[in-house]
């Protein structure tokens, strides 16, 4: 008769038992995490717009790929922020600014920031 390998701790558990327990726990944690993965989308638009207002405009626009609901949230933020010479907008062109403003929905911009270098 084969004896269970207790791993020297005297609990009689086999390596298979330990694996099964950890596997079940990992699956449960993954399932619990997946249930809450999109909780930010349940926030009201006004809160999402405030969050996006704290980001440079190009990063706020990138959130539009998250879901249909997010597609136009950035265009209702009261702040537009272009950071030209940094890593966010290399080679910022007037065409990029014009296209962004054309997609903007609000009738009034509360703040417009444009930082670029001519040369």
UniProtKB/Swiss-Prot annotation:
Signal peptide range: none
Protein name per UniProt: Putative F-box protein At2g39415
Protein's organism: Arabidopsis thaliana
CDD domains linked to this entry: F-box_AtFBL13-like
Residues of the F-box domain: 37-92
